[in-house]
A protein has these predicted regions:
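A conserved mid-protein helix/loop that constitutes part of the nucleotide-sugar donor-binding site
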Residues: 17-22, 202-225, 243, 325
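Glycosyltransferase donor-sugar binding loop
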Residues: 41, 174, 207-212, 232-245
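A short, active-site helix/loop in glycosyltransferases that binds the activated sugar's phosphate group
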Residues: 134-169, 174-181
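A short helix/loop element that forms part of the nucleotide-sugar donor recognition site in Leloir-type
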Residues: 180-197, 344
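A short, well-ordered alpha-helix in the C-terminal region of glycosyltransferases
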Residues: 190-193, 339-353, 365
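Aromatic "clamp/platform" in nucleotide-sugar-dependent glycosyltransferases that forms part
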Residues: 261, 280
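Short hydrophobic beta-strand element within catalytic cores of glycosyltransferases
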Residues: 297-300
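Conserved acidic donor-binding segment of nucleotide-sugar-dependent glycosyltransferases
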Residues: 312-313, 317-324, 333-338
């Protein structure tokens, strides 16, 4: 089968990009001939790339022009199946890794001040994305939507006129050899020494771009409420508002570290004791699976798809977004539970259910079924 995967841009810290980069070899091992359609091939390490890079000014023009050019390119090439990771109406398969934009705007509006809500309502890019999203999900050519969590599947089913049988929940996969407890043991001592933390310190790790959406403010406020000198928060990721969050964390001094984006986060997973992501909206972060694979338990919010694989007290905990006292309580609970020694094994066992080959196998079955239906 000749499969085209469509993703506009490469961001080395992006979850969708990591998914594609790791899924490509697994799909090829399963016998799929994969071509990546993108603006620039740098960074992807794909064997087959079809570049489409039309001129643009501004975000709306950028996305519209790429969608138009990508559709023209895949029609000329005659692929068996088109899987888009962008909101492009007319594809065969859409992977909803970014969730539902309209749902995120609804959740964001609940906590945003008046002027921010007004700006969101008038923002032409939000209007464009919501319109493209509706056209995509309700397009007659769309045959399947790959949802990376039940949460996303439910949001699409409730929000759009789409047949439920088109929705398929396929959790992301994780490279179990690249992220492993053995690697954590190798890196842990040096990584903690570099950070300057003591053996008895409890290090919570936050990994993600888009700090407000990922709930960094609540994590910082929870650390203030905990008021434990031995609790640290290490932040890995980039954000346009980094300075604002750094100012919020300033009273905590060295106990909050902003490390910026990292292409290899394994040393930080190794240094950490618990992963934390109290997101306001997060379809299913790859970073949660990476943390599990390294043997880290996780605290995530109920608005995060990773909550679906959390067993409270066994491999992690589920909090409510923006519930600062609740998050602080779970940080204390995590600190106590980490001393029992069973959490790392349970976290790793969770990740082992979601290897890359398992994910590729499920996708290959879906592609084969779609091919049979088209025959």
């Amino acid at each position: 089968m000749r499969l085209a995967i469509v993703r506009q841009r490469y961001n080395p810290f992006g979850g969708a990009e990591r998914f594609i980069s790791r899924a490509l070899p697994a799909l090829e091992r399963a016998g799929t001939d994969v071509t990546l359609i993108c603006r620039k091939e740098a960074g992807w390490a794909a064997r087959k790339v079809l570049r489409v890079d039309p001129f643009y000014v501004g975000k709306v023009w950028r996305d519209w022009s790429f969608a138009r050019a990508a559709r023209a390119a895949w029609r000329r090439a005659g692929f068996d199946l088109i899987q888009s990771h962008e909101r492009i109406p007319g594809c065969d398969v859409y992977r909803a890794g970014d969730g539902v934009h309209r749902r995120w705007l609804e959740l964001r509006s609940r906590v945003a001040p008046l002027f921010e809500r007004l700006g969101m309502a008038l923002n032409p890019y939000h209007r464009y994305v919501c319109a493209a999203e509706r056209q995509l999900f309700e397009h007659p050519r769309l045959r399947a939507v790959i949802c990376n969590s039940r949460m996303v599947s439910d949001e699409i089913r409730r929000g759009f006129r789409i047949a439920p049988e088109k929705l398929h929940v396929v959790y992301s996969g994780v490279d179990l050899a690249h992220f492993s407890p053995r690697k954590r043991d190798e890196l842990r001592g040096a990584a903690r020494a570099e950070l300057g933390c003591q053996p008895r310190d409890t290090l919570f790790l936050f990994v993600g771009a888009g700090f407000a959406r990922k709930g960094l403010g609540a994590a910082i406020d929870a650390l203030k409420l905990v008021n434990e000198r031995s609790f640290w928060l290490v932040v890995v990721g980039t954000d346009r508002e980094s300075r604002r969050f750094a100012a919020l964390a300033a009273p905590l001094g060295e106990r909050v570290r902003f490390l910026g984006g990292r292409e290899d986060v394994r040393p930080l997973y190794a240094a950490a004791d618990c992963f934390i992501l109290p997101s306001r909206y997060d379809p299913f972060p790859n970073t949660a699976l990476e943390a599990f694979a390294m043997g880290l338990p996780a605290i995530v919010s109920s608005r995060c798809g990773a909550a679906e694989i959390i067993e409270p007290g066994v491999n992690g905990w589920v909090c409510e977004a923006d519930d600062v006292p609740g998050i602080a309580k779970l940080m204390h609970e995590a600190d106590r539970a980490l001393r029992t020694g069973s959490l790392p094994q349970a976290a790793r066992a969770t990740a082992e259910r979601y290897g890359m080959d398992e994910m590729a196998g499920k996708l290959s079955v879906l592609y084969a079924n779609l091919a049979r239906e088209a025959a």
